[in-house]
Structures are given as C-alpha cells and as structure tokens.
Amino acid sequence: MTEAMKITLSTQPADARWGEKATYSINNDGITLHLNGADDLGLIQRAARKIDGLGIKHVQLSGEGWDADRCWAFWQGYKGPKGTRKVEWPDLDDAQRQELDNRLMIIDWVRDTINAPAEELGPSQLAQRAVDLISNVAGDRVTYRITKGEDLREQGYMGLHTVGRGSERSPVLLALDYNPTGDKEAPVYACLVGKGITFDSGGYSIKQTAFMDSMKSDMGGAATVTGALAFAITRGLNKRVKLFLCCADNLISGNAFKLGDIITYRNGKKVEVMNTDAEGRLVLADGLIDASAQKPEMIIDAATLTGAAKTALGNDYHALFSFDDALAGRLLASASQENEPFWRLPLAEFHRSQLPSNFAELNNTGSAAYPAGASTAAGFLSHFVENYQQGWLHIDCSATYRKAPVEQWSAGATGLGVRTIANLLTA
C-alpha cells in the first residue's frame, strides 16, 4: 500500500490560481478541501469523489475540523463498487468514533448487499444476510422465522408465492422479532416491511434491457429497512420492533404468473394482475397484512416500487407517502437531522380507488386514466394496512441506487434512508 495522501480542511478559499470556484487544492503536503459554510458536507462528499477519480486509494484525514459527519461525508463520496480503498481516520472522541464505526459497518453492508449480483444474492441469501446482520448487533434479543416455497402458499402468502413461483429459487418471507424487553407479551412498537425482489425481469410484462440492467437492486427496500433496524439497535433502541422481508425473483418460466391472474389475499382482497412488472406491491401486501396484525404504533414499508417516483424526484430524494401528517412530519424531521433527502408526494383517498378491475376488487396497476403511478401504488398498498390513515409510512426508494456515477456518488447503491428510519425509531 502506498503512503497515505493527507486530506485537510480549511475555511479559507483556495489560491486564486486554482480558479474562483475551486473546492480543493493540491500542495506538497497533500490535498486541502476549502469549506465555504454553505454546504460543507456536500462539498466534502463531492471532493472525495474527485479524489477517488484521481486514482488515490489511500488517504489520511488529517488536521483540525474533522468530526463523524464530515468523515462520513468523505466516505460516502470516496467509496466505490470496484477496488479497495483505505482511510486513516482522524482522532475522534469515543462517541463520535463509535457512531462512525457503526455507519461504516451497517450502511456499507446495505450498499454492498444492494450492489451484489443477483446470481449470488437470491431470496434465501438475502433473508439470511439480514438475519446475520441483525444478530450481530442484537445477539439473543432476536428471534426469527423463515418461510419459503410451497409453505408460503399453504400459509396464505399468495402475493409472495405468486410472484416468486416462476423462479427456481424459492420465494422467502423473513419475519424477525427484535425484543429487547425480555417480555414475550411486550407490545410491538413498530413494524418494518421491505420489498426484497432479488431480480426483476418484469415477468411477462418484460422490461427492456435499459430498464432491466439495474434490477439486481430491486431489493433495495429490504436492505434499507434491515440496515435501519440494525443501526437503531446500535443507537440504543429499547422497544420491540418486527421486520418483515418479502423476498423473491420475478422471472419468466412455464410456472410464472400471468396477466389476468387473480390473487386472493388473507384479508379477503382480490387483485387482478394486469402488469407482472408491478410485482413489488403484490409481495409487500403480504408483509403489510402481517405487520397490521401486530397492532404496532407505526408501520414503515420501503420499496424500490415505481419509476414514477424517480420521474418526479430523480435519484436524489426518497419519496414519502402517508395519510398521517404528524408521522410524516416526524420522519421528515428525522431526515433533516440526518442530512438525508426525503420529499413527500401526494397520497389521498381518491388514489385508493384509481385501480379499477372488471374481475376483482383491485387492479395491480392504475389505468391510463390515472397516471399518478407512485401515488396509486401507495394507494394500492393502503388496502393491506388495517389502519392506513394513522401510523403508516410508505417510502418509495428512488434514491437507493444510481446506474451511473455523479459528482457526489459512485455508481451503485447509496445507503440513503437507513439513518433517517433509525432516527425515527429511536426518537
């Protein structure tokens, strides 16, 4: 390993020879980042991306001004999916170093898991990785159940079974119970539900290559809520939380589900499938039914659910939907505290009725007459939340993954959302 490049911080502008807008400069001692007080964390992250682009793979964060948030901003921009990087961290107090170490362990797990090829990360592997992560931070305070294949059908998990039956890799439901109270009868404070589609071809409503090539990341919601629970535990979560991951491949085969199929759920809802590429909501419905049965104070689901959310927000914000204004406000406050980008999009009662079917109670996709695709998807999910008007948040994870690098991120997963959800759980 080469000698480390020193990275220092300065509140003074760069020498004029570097240009009026220079955010970093290079000298005999290393690289200096020039903070301007306007968006220092963003500046650090963008500079780190440029430093990585220069091929510098060993750095030392040196001098005054570094804290956990600034170190983390550097790492978010510096980390990439290829090669190895080494950072020598500055001296931090014990609490800040522990916070940084937990972010490095858990949010890097989220990014690496989302980036993993679908060939090595199927439904069972995703569920087991989630169990391993949570068990590592929670020890014996965790119990779990994994249900897969035909057992899902026999137990009534018809959405998950229907979507996943076309793959040779069985669909899987992970139900994990984090109970730090030691009381088996303790009330459940929150339930987290994640979409874990480990590869999404679109099924018979097949995607074009340009839309399929990133679909190893369609389990980003499951990874995000798993990371959020783990991170909340490291921050002292002392309430009971249950995690439900709905994991499957969405593939084409002689056994795959088809347009016109009707799925009957355990809550009595019948859904006509008119787009096999709107599969995420079909598997989440099973998880939301289980979550509702726990009678928690809050339910949070996370999913890379719609292209419509990305059309509205790009890859820069997660989309938030809720009927509960107070709870939505709390999550947005948590996002602000954690410097993570969330934006609330509309969800109204009329979105719940914009999924008409001639043969069932619901269609799994909105018709051309109702083009608000992200809102109608949230409206669909609300039919599987018992008390959907209170205590329920839906996150359409549009900021989970980037197909190409940008000035502050490498290509691949971002890990955004983990800290916000953990903040809300521990508030």
Swiss-Prot record:
It holds the Pfam family Peptidase_M17. Binds 2 manganese ions per subunit. Mn(2+) 1 binds at D200, D277, E279. GO terms for molecular function: manganese ion binding; metalloaminopeptidase activity. It comes from Shigella flexneri serotype 5b (strain 8401). It is found in: Cytoplasm. HAMAP family: Aminopeptidase_M17 (MF_00504). Homohexamer. Belongs to the peptidase M17 family. One of its GO terms (cellular component) is cytoplasm. Gene3D superfamilies: Zn peptidases. The active site is at K207, R281. It catalyses: Release of an N-terminal amino acid, Xaa, from a peptide or arylamide. Xaa is preferably Glu or Asp but may be other amino acids, including Leu, Met, His, Cys and Gln. GO terms for biological process: proteolysis. This is Peptidase B. Its cofactor is Mn(2+). Mn(2+) 2 binds at K195, D200, D218, E279. Probably plays an important role in intracellular peptide degradation. Its EC number is 3.4.11.23. The gene is pepB. Keywords: Aminopeptidase, Cytoplasm, Hydrolase, Manganese, Metal-binding, Protease.
